[in-house]
Amino acid sequence: MCLRRRYQWYYLFGFVHPASGRTEWLLTTTVSGAGMSAALKDFAARVGAGTTRRMVLVLDGAGWHRSKSLVVPEGIHLVFQPPYSPALQPAENLWPLVHEVVANRDFRALDELKDVVSERCTELSSNPAVVKRRTLYHWWPRDHHPKVE
């Protein structure tokens, strides 16, 4: 019997607006300052962040979140939660929702895993009520300034 081990990875960036349940997702092959910069740029473009629309993102202290090479787009402001406090991060409650479709499954190819995760992210994006129930803590700020179009 020949055993061939190899490892390939996909990483999932998840962004959530707890008050609305809106999510944005980005699957990537790397987590690094450059990867996070690309994720922030993609996110800013999707939500229209810029000079007239500002977003606050709450992040943990992961190395790629604080990388010296990180490029933060205009309109995005990063706020870092205290160390070892995942309970303060609403996005942490997204991961069990994603994991439930991949747990205890054998994927023959990385693309198969990517397809399953992408489909799950699409399902979650189309079910903001489910996301909101999991991420909108009673103490989390609500929107006090409705979007003006």
PLM segments and residue spans:
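Extended, low-complexity cationic-aromatic segments
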Residues: 1-41, 137-148
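RNase H-like polynucleotidyl transferase catalytic core
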Residues: 1-5, 74-93
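Generic structural signal for small/hydrophobic residues in well-ordered secondary structure
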Residues: 14-15, 21, 60, 89, ...
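Acidic/histidine-rich, metal-coordinating catalytic segments
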Residues: 40, 51-65, 89
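Single, function-defining residue in the core of a domain
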Residues: 49, 57, 62, 78-81, ...
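Short, aromatic/basic amphipathic alpha-helical patches
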Residues: 67-75
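C-terminal anion-handling pockets and recognition modules
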Residues: 91-149
